[in-house]
Amino acid sequence: MDLIPSFSTETWLLLAISLVLLYLYGTYTHGIFRKLGIPGPTPLPFVGTALGYRNGFYVFDMKCFSKYGRMWGFYDGRQPVLAITDPDMIKTVLVKECYSVFTNRRTLGPVGFMKSAISLSEDEEWKRMRTLLSPTFTTGKLKEMFPIIGQYGDVLVNNLRKEAEKGKAINLKDVFGAYSMDVITSTSFGVNIDSLNHPQDPFVENTKKLLKFDFLDPFFFSILLFPFLTPVFEILNIWLFPKKVTDFFRKSVERMKESRLKDKQKHRVDFLQLMINSQNSKEMDTHKALSDLELVAQSIIFIFAGYETTSTSLSFLMYELATHPDVQQKLQEEIDATFPNKALPTYDALVQMEYLDMVLNETLRLYPIAGRLERVCKKDVEISGVFIPKGTVVMVPTFTLHRDQSLWPEPEEFRPERFSRKNKDSINPYTYLPFGTGPRNCIGMRFAIMNMKLALVRVLQNFSFKPCKETQIPLKLNAQGIIQPEKPIVLKVEPRDGSVNGA
């Protein structure tokens, strides 16, 4: 029996041509970096170098940095990506040529109306969003929001007290995750939730569904490798952000906005109210003001960008304090001197705390919120003698940069003194990028820092943290997407003086 089908010569020829064309399509871009003399791993047809992500993005970046030096090229599917670590090149990409060449981030895939969110919008639409939203994050507005965050600092202390009284070790992600969710949902949607004690609340459930996001999920990976599938997914009504979840938040914002517009009394200052105010400002041209759907998109992206990052950063920081008790004690001494007798923190005093700033900065060096920064090259350009073709994604491997031993002696060590007044002036600002930099840096950076500092002060006024038998030492990272600990960070929590000052 013949194992080879009996096709005509024309059919075989057509099949051969189709296979050749398919191969050429899957490899067409893969010679770009070789022609430019830029080193990097060897790509495979269609998948490029994406199989190198098996152990995580940042493990891949560290290996490439070690093997190829300060610049290398690789391929996410057919997409050429140029990794740069030279501070001058980074400055050019993120600052100098931001508006002209490197304005946009890579397109994520089928995102629907979320395309108007400030993190995902492009070119003139992004500039418009940034202009509209920047006043929301001024010092004055953050001061007005400070009491809202403060009340959840009290909830955090009370929740920790209940757990500490049980005498059991505490999973930090549970308590800091609840704090982060409470603050974000309160400031973005105007709702008050004690999420740790009300896990069935619709806002809690939908926020957690929104954040079930894995960069190595087959759906996301298929978009990464085959971006041309995006229109197909849109036709099939398949979205990166779950439609049921975005519909829930859209209806919630519409309901909240309607309620606030009906009630003429003065409302508290939060992101939702500030965005509503911008819609109704007489100084704002109608075509420039936020539409209702754009307002919803910003509220959702605040949750997406702020929840996981804040809770994870706080967990990492507490781990470092628990394993460096001398640093923890020194920070508590600064807190006690700044706010005697467990006085409630104030915004102005918080921003003046030098050692608190040092500890937070060093934590964000070791565990940067954004392990990678990306910009798409809009036209052919030459930077520092390197030609970058149009369509190339230029990537700054922040995690790798922050652990470069030529910049940070003994980079794996936790040393807040790196950021002392004496030392921080010697740090090149383009080698320390936990929130990015330039016109398209994280718009919520100052809010996130304030949020974390307030939580740290309230917690350390009342508790000390110590390792226990469940604590993983040394800490191992799960680098699939956002940097996370491989296992939950579990610590023993002890009241400092036997009494806890809560709400």
UniProtKB/Swiss-Prot annotation:
SUPFAM superfamilies: Cytochrome P450. PANTHER family: CYTOCHROME P450 3A5, CYTOCHROME P450 FAMILY 3. It is found in: Endoplasmic reticulum membrane; Microsome membrane. GO terms for cellular component: endoplasmic reticulum membrane. Pfam families: p450. Belongs to the cytochrome P450 family. Keywords: Endoplasmic reticulum, Heme, Iron, Membrane, Metal-binding, Microsome, Monooxygenase, Oxidoreductase. It is an enzyme of class 1 (oxidoreductase). It catalyses: an organic molecule + reduced [NADPH--hemoprotein reductase] + O2 = an alcohol + oxidized [NADPH--hemoprotein reductase] + H2O + H(+). It comes from the Eukaryota. It comes from Canis lupus familiaris. This is Cytochrome P450 3A12. The keyword Nucleotide-binding does not apply. Cytochromes P450 are a group of heme-thiolate monooxygenases. In liver microsomes, this enzyme is involved in an NADPH-dependent electron transport pathway. It oxidizes a variety of structurally unrelated compounds, including steroids, fatty acids, and xenobiotics. PROSITE patterns: CYTOCHROME_P450. The keyword Oxidoreductase applies. Gene3D superfamilies: Cytochrome P450. Heme binds at residue 442.
